[in-house]
Amino acid sequence: MTVRFMDVFTEWASTYDDTVTGHDPEYKEVFRRYEEILDTVATKAISPVVEFGAGTGNLTQRLLDRHQDVLAVEPSPEMREILIDKIPTLPVQDGHFLSFTADHAKSFVSTYAFHHLTDEEKGEAVDLMAQILPQDGKIVYADTMFVSEEARLQTIAEAKAQGFNGLAEDLEREFYPLIPVMEQIFASRGFDVTFTQYNHFVWLVEAEKMGE
């Protein structure tokens, strides 16, 4: 996973902040309610918190506004450089969902990142986080996902019809999950999980680790 989409991260690093603010019409709906999504993830997090795919630090800054103990994990050198320039005092680790070092955490969070993992890798990542989380610890993230395969294919067809070929290629290339698959991944690992939709693409997932 660490190198699978590294070229995408490298290409997007310099323009990511413009994209999330709606300047790219292809991704305008993907990032609708972006500020609200970030604020909600940050509010639901519990310190100490580990953020995966910290990128250019948009969620990271909100986490720091609310929590004392924040670790950012980011695989892209270009993204890490921007992040460190923005927040020089932040602990930043070169890593990703399947390769990181965290001795303790009460929550793991991410936004627009979990889809880089295959469904099998998503399960592996949840296993790794579950080993560290205490009872009542949480995994909180926002990402594109679909209620069914039919919904995913329909969204791709609509993107192509609008001439949003970059978005369509993105939806076909990466591993955007189905909600029933994610429900099974979390439930089978002892998490109580909820899904809340924020726009056509993005859902917020809050998974709490239950007792034995």
UniProtKB/Swiss-Prot annotation:
* Keywords, in A-Z order: Methyltransferase, S-adenosyl-L-methionine, Transferase
Q: Name one GO molecular function term.
A: S-adenosylmethionine-dependent methyltransferase activity
One of the protein's GO biological processes: methylation
Q: Name one Pfam family in it.
A: Methyltransf_25
Please verify whether the record's keywords include Transferase: yes
- Positions binding S-adenosyl-L-methionine in this chain are 53, 74
Judging by the UniProt lineage, the source's domain of life is Bacteria
Q: What is its EC number?
A: 2.1.1.-
Q: Which InterPro entries match?
A: Methyltransf_25, SAM-dependent_MTases_sf, Uncharacterised_MeTfrase_YrrT
What broad class of enzyme is this?
transferase
HAMAP family in the cross-refs:
Methyltr_YrrT (MF_02100)
Q: Which family does it belong to?
A: Belongs to the methyltransferase superfamily. YrrT family.
Q: What is this protein called?
A: Uncharacterized methyltransferase Exig_2346
